[in-house]
Structure formats: structure tokens, C-alpha cells
């Protein structure tokens, strides 16, 4: 029900408040006979007419507008008829009506939004034209001002027009939508603007055709001043207000209220700005000059990578290579020379680099003469085992190192520095004398300044003494001969000097240039003279180094300590090594955490010729590697990674594969027995010496295969490797840790512990011989000639022999040959002489034999009888 329902009544209705709600009851029926009464209230809907509908006759009032008004837009559609009363509507009809109203409201909002956009567009065009005309007029007035000073009287009509404009503006318009059209803005100030506005009218086809026209007499164009032109237009009525008054507000309508006025997206704004920017620079675009780049080209590079470095298209590079006759793709690798041709052709500069540039080469880095300062000499003591090298060094240092060495022999290279009575410093290197430590002696000879050749006066020149002489000559360092054990009665120094002549070593006592001295480590005789000669030789050499630079050192020995980690005994060649320096040594890098001298004291810096023990290296380096201090950890890691890659490539490098090589390798593998080993030593030099010594005892029948060799305690990985390969673990001065010991006991892995190297080599040699098995030794004891063959029994044949040489015994092995070709290998099963069985027949006698498992016997064959003895093999 609504307020518009007018029912006829006989009398006047009683006074009272009208209720906007009508109540009623609805009976609901459910299953199982249940019912329920619900009170339903129906609210009346209040209808409000749109403004202007109540006074339709006010439309002619628009004729009072003095300015020519463009065609008015069509009036809004009449409001829909009021919906039927709620009491006469079903629920489905109500839903359909609400949906229809919501759809009509949405379409009306969309139409209003389109009209608003069209109005804004027309208004912007009109404003732009107005500004252009004002600018042109201002320029014309400025140009005409000097010629016609009386011209300002012309715009006298402007105030009158300005006065008449406000009177015409507030005239009521029949249609409320006319006030929102762009024509409601002030009329243009100049007459030529009117035809332009008329031309712009057909540009809005989106506006629907008008339903009625307001007759307006064409008025003369009125020239208005700028103030009137800038007067703001009448405030436009908000669409939301009209929507609010336009009937019932529904949920759908409220949610879709702003759908027609959607803002521009961020992407649309970006596209518009980019379009403006391109339009702005369109006239200024000029061909850019090609940028010349410095292109870094390694030894090998792909076409795509080269194109990226040149900032060129990869397809252009491929085309250029095609012109050069090279059919390549962008993923193929080209060499440095081809890359240089491409870089030059495209107008860039090339910078050649090589992978080896990542490495450090200090050989060409020579210190200036003025920066060099005197340094202590480095003296290496070399000689045969048990000739008293360590005892001599103990006498010089005042220590007793010999007593703590296993077997009384030196198996590590030691570095010490002593201070003489005169305050001078001398660095000594003690090298092992055993034949297995050749590499240690070579390293000692290469890093030293002076070599002291120790020869026992009661023993003479031995193999390792001669080897030390050759190493010294190869290193090109001066030599001092120390003839030891002068306290023994068998001491014969003159005999030693004469033996040295065989190796082109002439001592001063025999008019030569090699110094010699007779010493005794037990009594101390000759030690002062030895030190004096060392200092004299060092003075002649003029040993100098630059201490004020980055340090360089040589690794003398390296090991893995359980508590300290990787340790390296280094000898500083030049510069000063300090705590905190970043270093790279071989394939390892790190930072100096601490340094210890030969007495175990911590030092902060180590100058030239000072041996120190360095802590802080990432891994155990190889003995003989060069330690170099670098500027940063990144540089150290780069150098270490490059050296590691190079070492891996060298280790895994193989010869070109061919069928011949494959078959020969397969045959060699089948013919040679391999004896696998896992080796762990206390220091790097000992591990190296053990590997070299074991490789020397390999033969053509059996050879040692080192599965792994390292420094430090035996670990679980070593045990697992040994178990998988069936190899024994050899520990040299090391023991397994707790977990490894448990694995060894559980898996029954063989372990061998040694502390003297020659005991290790002897044991492995006997083990390898046992793998070969006993050796069969054949000894020929007699020969005979077959004179006649006759049958013996049903199948066998007997041979009548004449013993030519030696003796023939029953049960011995025999070879039957015919024309110097072995026919069969057999055994003498029966031996008779004149029908009697005899144990043996000597030379010159005849006999009959029955050979086992063979009947291929002919007259004239030769029979060779031999004994077989099984002996244990030796290597």
C-alpha cells in the first residue's frame, strides 16, 4: 500500500496518525503436521517525484537566456509506475521486481557516467580553444597598442554584457539535466568562437537524440570581458542526490552506485605518460653514437656470452661468423683469436685474459736493491743415515733430539734457529738420511743457502752421501764437508777426502775450494770452527732480503694436529709474516691465527730466514708448496680454487682413447696383481716418502695401489674405504680415533702400525710376496732317448729308454719332446729293468718306463726328467 491509494468514503475519515506499517499473520505448515503463525509487517513506500515534474509548464522560461543555447539533452525517462501493493505481490514477483529495479538503476548510472565523460571532454576542448583565442587576442592587442592608443574604448559593451549575464543565468530550466551540459558554461568572449562551438556539436554522438526543443531567438554574439569568462559555472547537481531521491534504495543499487565512475588504472596512467614522453622526444630523436666497450675475453668463450659482454645481439655475431665461414650457434665455444676478430669488427676494444692470470706468479717480482737488508743464512745438514747429522745439530743447539726419535733415525725434516756467541743467527734444516726420504732432501737442498755434508770418518761415503752430493750440485749451493765421529779410533779423515775426489769435490786441504772440518758431536771438538766457516761462507754470499713487504715462504713440513688442526712448518724467504695475514699455500687458503717458533713460543711476526709453525690454514698443504700473502680472502679463495681445478684436471687427465689402448690396459690389469693400501702418516713428508718407497717395491707381477694417503689420525672414512676394498690400513706414527677403533673391531679390518719406515717397507714387501704364492723351481735330473715302443696291457704303451744323462727316478715329472717340440707333460708311473721294478736308473743303462696319462710315444722321442721345488717368493 502507498500514500497515493485514494478509496472513496461516504464521510470524513477520523483524525489520526497514519501508520506506515500494516501488520498481518501468515500460517506456516511443516512436516509431521506442525504449523506456525508468523506476524508479517508490510511497510508503505513513500513516492517522491523528480524536481520539475510537478511544473511541466515551466519549460518555456528557458527562452529568456540571451545567449544561443545548444540543443538540450533528452529528459530523463519518466519514473516507473509504482509497484503493486505488497499485499498483492508474491515472493517471486517481488524478487523479479527488485532485480529489474537494480538493473535499471545500474543502466541509469552507466548512462549518467557516459554523459559526464562526454561533458568533460567537450568542456576540455572548449577551454583549450578559449585559451588559444585569448592568447592570440592578447598578442594582437599587444602588437596594435602602439599604433592605436584610443583602442581601449572598444570593449565598453563588456560591462553591460556582464550585467545581463547574471540576470539570464538563474532562469529556471524545465529539464534538470540541462544544467549539467557543457553549454551551461559562460558564452565565449569572441564572436568567432560561436561557429567553432557549432562545429564541435556533432562530435558527441554518444548523447541520445533530444525529445523536445526549446525555441530560443538567435541573439547577437555578446563580447564578454575576461572576468565574465572566468566566472565559475553554475554548480552542477550531484548525481548521487538525484539517485537518493529517485525511489527505493536497494542493496544492489547501493553496491553498484559508483560503478559508472570507475577511476583509471595505474597501468593506463603509465601508458599515457609513456606515450606523452615518446611524443615529446619524437622530434628530438637523433641517431646515437655507438658506445665503444672494453670487452674482457678469456681463452674460450661462448658466442652468447661474448654478445652479452659486447652488448650486441647474438644473432649479429652468428651472422658475422657465417660470413667468416664458421657455422656456429650461440651456445658454441670459440677461441680467443676468433673472439678478437668479432670484437674488432663490431668496433670494441678487447682485453685478453687467461685462466692462469688468476694464479700468483712472484718470480718476476724483484725487490729494489735499496730495500734489501742482511738476513741469517739457511744451512741444511745432509748425509747418510746414522752418520751423526742430528747429533751434530744437537751439539750445536745444546739439545737432545736423537733420544726422542724412533729407531734412532730422523724421519722428519726439522727447522731450527740458533744464536751464536757473537750474536749472529743461523737457521738449520735437518733432513732424513734414509733412502726413502729423497724428496725431503731435494726440498732441503732447494731452499738452503749452504749445505753441510756429513760423512762419518769411520764409515766412508755411502749411497745417500753420494745422493746428497748430487742434490747439492743440482741446487747450485756451496758445500761444507763435516767429517764426524772424530773421537773414535777408527777415524780416517784422509781416506774420506780421497773418496770425495771421485765425485769432483776437492777440499781446501787438497788445494780445492770446498771447506772441510773434523768434528765430534760427543766431545764438541770442531763445532766452533764449523760455525766460523758457516758465517764466513754466508758473508761471501752476501745474503739479503726485503723484510718490508708481503711475506713469501716455503713449506718445509706439514701435518694435521688433533688439537690445533692443520699445521705447516714454513721458512720465510722474504718479507715479514704476521699474525692475521691472509695467505694462500698450494691448493689451500686461510689466515694466520698463530705462529710458533722452534722452541714452541708464540711469535707475532716472522722475518726472513726464520722457520715458524703456522696455524690457521684451511687444509694440510703439500710439503714444498709456496706460501704467499694476498690482500683479501676473496683473492685467496680464487687462487686456491684455480689451483685445485688444475690439480684435479691433471690427476684425471687420460690419454686419447683407442681400442688398442683399451685392450692393452685390460690385459695389463688382468696380468698384474694389485695390492691395495690405505696410508695415514703424522706429517706430509712422511706420507710422501712412504708412497714413493712402496711404489719402488712394485714388480711386473704385483704392484701397490694406494687408495688413499693423508695426514692425521685414522678416521671412520678410512676404515669404510679399507673395508669396501679389502685393503689393510697402514698407520705411521698415528692411531685411530675412538669411532674408527670401534669400526675396526666390528668390521675386522686389518691394521698395521709402524714408527720406522724401513720396517714398514719390509712388512709390505713380504705381504705382497705372499699374495703371489710360492714359486715352482724346476731342476732337470736326467735325460733319455726312446728306442722302442711296445704294448703294456690292453691300452697302455711302454717305452724302452736309453738313459743319456743323469738319472731317472720313479714318480718324477717328465716332458716328452719330439723334434724339440713338447708333446706332453707327464709323470713316470712305472720304472723297470729286466722285468724288475727299480727306483732309479743311471746314465748309460737301458730301462722300460710307463708314462701316466699318455700313449703318444714314438721311437726317437726325447724324455726329460725334472724335480719341482716350491719356494716362497721374494720381491
Curated annotation (Swiss-Prot):
Gene3D superfamilies (UniProt xref): P-loop containing nucleotide triphosphate hydrolases (3.40.50.300), Translation factors (2.40.30.10), Translation initiation factor IF- 2, domain 3 (3.40.50.10050)
Superkingdom, natural source: Bacteria
Family classification: Belongs to the TRAFAC class translation factor GTPase superfamily. Classic translation factor GTPase family. IF-2 subfamily.
Signal peptide span: none
Residue segments, region G4: 484-487
Family matches, as NCBIfam families: IF-2, small_GTP
Region (G3): 430-433
Name this polypeptide is given: Translation initiation factor IF-2
Compositionally biased tracts (Basic and acidic residues): 88-102, 126-140, 223-246
Any Gene Ontology CC annotation: cytosol
Keyword Cytoplasm found: yes
Chain residue ranges for the region called G5: 520-522
Disulfide cysteine pairs (residue numbers): none
Residues that span the membrane, as ranges: none
Biased composition, class Pro residues, residue ranges: 67-85
Chain segments carrying region Disordered: 1-20, 47-102, 126-246
Recorded name of the encoding gene: infB
Function noted in UniProt: One of the essential components for the initiation of protein synthesis. Protects formylmethionyl-tRNA from spontaneous hydrolysis and promotes its binding to the 30S ribosomal subunits. Also involved in the hydrolysis of GTP during the formation of the 70S ribosomal complex.
Region (G1): 383-390
Keyword Nucleus appears in the UniProt entry: no
Species in which this protein is naturally found: Novosphingobium aromaticivorans (strain ATCC 700278 / DSM 12444 / CCUG 56034 / CIP 105152 / NBRC 16084 / F199)
